[in-house]
Design a protein with these regions (language model features):
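Membrane-helix interface/capping segments
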Residues: 77, 81-96, 264-271
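Long, contiguous internal "core" modules enriched in hydrophobic/ aromatic residues
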Residues: 15-17, 24-44, 133-332, 345
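Flexible loop linkers connecting adjacent transmembrane helices
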Residues: 53, 86-100, 124-133
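Core segments of transmembrane alpha-helices
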Residues: 332-340
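Central hydrophobic cores of alpha-helical transmembrane segments
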Residues: 354-364
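N-terminal signal-anchor module of multipass membrane proteins
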Residues: 1-77
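Central hydrophobic cores of alpha-helical transmembrane segments in multi-pass inner-membrane proteins
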Residues: 3-11, 71-89, 108, 159-162
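Transmembrane alpha-helix boundary signature
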Residues: 43-47, 115-127
Length: 383
């Protein structure tokens, strides 16, 4: 990337803004069909009841909440990766920073759908928000679920500002190469950016401020998500390790999702000179670190249960490894901790195919981790 000029990079990126090909519209059509199928399934659930989604007693939190935690983790990791690497002046973050931040904004929107879908009476969702109403009903602000609403709304606001601030020079570059209606749109979006020295000075300070603000905010917000479980009395959930455990898992899954998204786009848009193999290597090395941290969290959970001599806790973790959902537990450990260790070998982390496959495996594993926590945590009765 050091051999590229800024003009060449701009032109490479701008080349992707040409009118889309037929294959693009086919993909859009397929995604639209998928969305319509999902809407039809949701309408069926509203008509019949949420039991069709697998919610039952004792597993009242099913796949909807699994998906919620998974996508919130992806959302938090994008900004966290970009912000932390910016604070540490890691230059290799630049080619993937915008993608990670964009992934964050859209993942928050996806995550927000699942509590809404999970509601039996979705048309009364406004009761979840502190809005004045004639029935004088107010949310319970002591509930972790209300913590979620406030924390994620705050996070969406800050991450969107962080993302948009970083985009300003890019939007101006598109504006300068556009004509007609596109020029007018990007002129508004670029907020008068001209690239003057004074603008760059304010830009770098503002971007640094948002990075410094976003880093602790992301950690605190995902800790709040973990409190949905940790503040309950369910064995396996009621533990103080959940906050760092969830944050580490979010970064782990987010790094894997960056690889999952960047590798196909790198090939499709011919970004090989910008998103170099060295950049992908660094992401893979970081996945090794986060995978070891997640593995440490798995072991620490068992150690805490054993050391506490709490028979119910010990039974919960024994059942996790030997009970009905033991396959999910071992699949989780394999995908999240053991397989990422293959990135230790240079041949593995410099081969595009293995990078992509292992990133998919980590994403599957992180989804199953949430399954093991949410479903496995309440499926075992203690009566």
């Amino acid at each position: 990337m050091s051999q590229l000029t800024y003009a060449k990079i701009d032109q490479t990126i701008l080349d992707t803004l040409t009118p889309p090909k037929k294959s693009y519209w086919i993909l859009v059509f397929l995604l639209l069909v998928g969305a319509l199928i999902g809407a039809a399934c949701w309408a069926y659930q509203i008509a019949v009841g949420i039991g069709v989604g697998g919610q039952n007693n004792p597993v009242a939190w099913g796949t909807y909440l699994i998906n919620f935690v998974f996508w919130v983790g992806i959302a938090h990791s994008g900004t966290l990766i970009s912000a932390i690497l910016h604070l540490f002046r890691a230059g290799w973050r630049n080619p993937i920073a915008r993608a990670a931040e964009t992934m964050t904004v859209f993942a928050v929107c996806v995550a927000g759908l699942f509590p809404f879908i999970h509601l039996g009476r979705a048309w009364q969702v406004y009761y979840m928000f502190p809005l004045p109403n004639q029935r004088l009903l107010w949310p319970n602000f002591l509930s972790p679920l209300m913590f979620d609403v406030i924390a994620i709304s705050t996070y969406l606001t800050v991450s969107s500002l962080f993302w948009y601030t970083g985009l300003l020079p890019d939007l101006a570059a598109v504006r300068d190469k556009s004509t007609g209606t596109r020029y007018k749109i990007f002129k508004i979006l670029s907020l008068g950016w001209t690239g003057a020295h004074e603008q760059w000075r304010h830009y770098t300070r503002g971007y640094l401020f948002f990075a410094a603000l976003a880093t602790p905010l992301v950690i605190s917000v995902h800790s709040v998500v973990s409190w949905d479980f940790a503040l309950g009395i369910v064995p396996g959930w009621h533990t103080t390790i959940f906050a760092p455990y969830f944050v580490a898992g979010a970064i782990h899954s987010g790094l894997a999702m960056v690889l999952t998204l960047m590798i196909p786009l790198r090939k499709l848009f011919k970004y090989e000179d910008i998103i170099t193999i060295e950049v992908l290597q660094n992401v893979a090395k970081t996945i090794v670190l986060t995978g070891l941290i997640v593995g440490l969290a798995y072991g620490t959970e068992y150690f805490i249960a054993w050391y506490s001599h709490n028979t119910i806790e010990m039974e919960q973790f024994r059942w996790r490894a030997l009970g009905d959902y033991r396959w999910g537990f071992y699949f989780m450990v394999l995908c999240n901790t053991l397989i990422p260790l293959l990135f230790v070998f240079k041949k593995v982390r410099t081969t595009i195919a293995t990078l992509f496959i292992i990133s998919l495996i980590v994403n599957f594993g992180m989804w199953w981790e949430r399954f093991v926590i949410i479903v496995g945590g309440v499926a075992h009765g203690f009566a």
